[in-house]
Amino acid sequence: KVSDKKFNEALKEAKNYSSEVIIEKSFNGPEYTVALLKGKPLTPLQILHDPIRGFYDYEAKYNSQNTQKIKIEDESIVKRLKEISEKVFDCLNCKTWARVDFVSEGEKLAVIEINSVPGFTAKSLFPLAAKYSGIEYKELISLIIEDC
């Protein structure tokens, strides 16, 4: 993530490694994630970044005590996230499980990626979404294996 002031400097640095550089718009709103099991969305989650780190990197994701993953209270956002994630899952011909990640700004929601083999550690988002949906870890594993 680069500020406008440091953009040219960062672009020059990136071009030291490759002549081709990917530049993405930064969204300043909340980040969301929706885990899908057999094409059906589980409880969508909002990711509240560690305010000290300011960016959801490896450290913030796995080691920070300040990063939070919470249920979304706004039902209209939950509905939109579920609808979009189901379309993405189907469009990409996913089968058993996946996780769709979103960024937002104002009313805009943007899909940033789909994880066709999402993380599955004790701190991962997929098992947490399943737990909030009433599916315990062992049952989740069984459901995934049964569908393969």
Can you say where each PLM-predicted feature lies in the sequence?
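Phosphate-binding site of ATP-dependent enzymes
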Residues: 4-80, 109-110
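Aromatic/hydrophobic pocket-lining residues that form π-stacking "cages" and hydrophobic walls in ligand
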Residues: 10, 85, 126
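Conserved metal-phosphate-binding beta-hairpin within the catalytic cores
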Residues: 25, 34, 89-122, 130
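Gly/Ser/Thr-rich helix-start
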Residues: 30, 120, 135
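Short secondary-structure capping/turn micro-motifs that flank functional sites
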Residues: 30-31, 105-106, 146-147
